[in-house]
Amino acid sequence: GVLDIGSNSIRLVVFEGDGRMPIPLFNEKALCGLGMGLQETGHLSEQGVRSAMDNLERYFTIAKGMGVSEVRVLATAAVRDARNGHEFVSAVEGRFGARVMVLSGDEEARLSALGVVSAFPEADGVVGDLGGGSLELVDIQNNKARRFETTPLGPLRLGELTRQNRDELTDRIDSSLNGVLWLDSMSGRDLFSVGGAWRSLARAHMELTDYPLAVIHHYAIGAEEAVRFLDEITRTGRKDLRALDAVSKRRVEKLPVTALVLKRVIELGRPRQVVFSSFGLREGCLYDRLPRGEQSRDPLVDSCMDIARKSSRFSPHPEVLERWIAPFFEDVPAAEQRLIRTACILSDFAWGEHPSYRGEHAFIRVLRLPVVGLNHADRVFLAYAILVRYTGSIEEEGTHRVRKLLSIRRRDLAYRVGLALRLALTLSGGATELLESARLERERDMVGERGFVISMHGHQGGLGGDVVTRRIAALSEALGQDIRIEH
């Protein structure tokens, strides 16, 4: 488990195992406000300390009851900077018998960046992690943190944004950001936004634009649109902000100032887009402890393999399925080959649902899977592919709302992938090892490609039948090429 003592909130996350993508079993936060008033007094809030100790009591009790082997306790800006921070740490260690790691600003920035790296393979840009007491900025490239900077721009330090202090707060924010000498390296790259306050802004944007997929991780907003939206938030009254269903009422008071910070980061850094990340410090703490070989594994593939092992009928052999359908998709780009591999992994995970609802259930579940390493369009691609695998149709009721997130070309590809999986799993009955003896190949002649042939000889010739014939006909029509069986 990881227990994160932040300036505004305390959160315990308990993970199952410690591999490349451990699954969260428990995730709860308490808004304690340890850093409330720190800028004026230099001390942790007395009320915040009382609330923190009460909630820590709960979290350590839960961790013990779950049999958690180790709880790593991390403390960030408020505890690091407060004059009585050492007293608080001593009180926690004495009462709960746990060592508290008070992270330096650089270490906090590094771990937050590693959390993003763990969730975004090949991430290239700048991580901005806004906590209650500070904003960490980290330049990441080639899965490494290159430069980092800590700035005192947490909302608890800045206070509330009003019409009267808008110019003063903007000057304070700009003064800190101008001290980040490499900030212009963000230009034209991605800004990865980490932290609960900024995730609240993402939720608000989703609600106001009627976005069809309520998944914060990898939600992206173009820089110009983000600046317009954030400016609107900074000028909206508290009453109207409280009317937003997607934003916690305890986050509303600080929403304008957190919007102003993000707006100035975008205006000064000039990224191409803002990408929101649900992975940060806690996940970076786990990722940092993995061997390098484990770190380099694909988080999407690993997560989906864990899901498949727990929910498939048979021991999953996605590599057999992937090899078998590969001739249909030889010309597909590498990024989509990776999604086809993932679709093969998930192709049987909804078998336990009622047959009338398998497609619907699989579609919704894939859209909402707690996995990373894919953007929202990728989620929709996988959801459609698995829907078609179960139903044979991409026009099922209830699936149209997310359609706009996927291009027509990719939707057509998802349809063909789903039909190919449907054929392969029908042919083998789900026991995909049988596909090893039903070879699929392209047919070519002197003129060029003629289509595909499935060679079934000996006892494997018995795999054919009416259902298989219908599946072949559907896929053949979608591909615009002949598929025939050779006995």
Listing of model-derived features with the role each one plays in the protein:
Residues 14-17, 33, 37-68, 76-90, ...:
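Helical "lid/coupling" subdomains associated with nucleotide-phosphate turnover
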Residues 1-4, 125-129, 191:
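Short glycine-aspartate micro-motif
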Residues 7, 132, 196:
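Short, glycine/acidic-enriched loop or turn micro-motifs at the edges of active sites
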Residues 1-23:
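N-terminal basic/disordered segments at the start of proteins
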Residues 21-36:
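N-terminal glycine-rich anion-binding loops that anchor highly charged ligand groups
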Residues 73:
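Dinucleotide-binding Rossmann-like beta1-alpha1 core, especially the glycine-rich loop
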Residues 124-138:
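A generic, well-ordered mixed alpha/beta core segment in the N-terminal half of proteins
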Residues 479-487:
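A short amphipathic beta-strand at an alpha->beta junction
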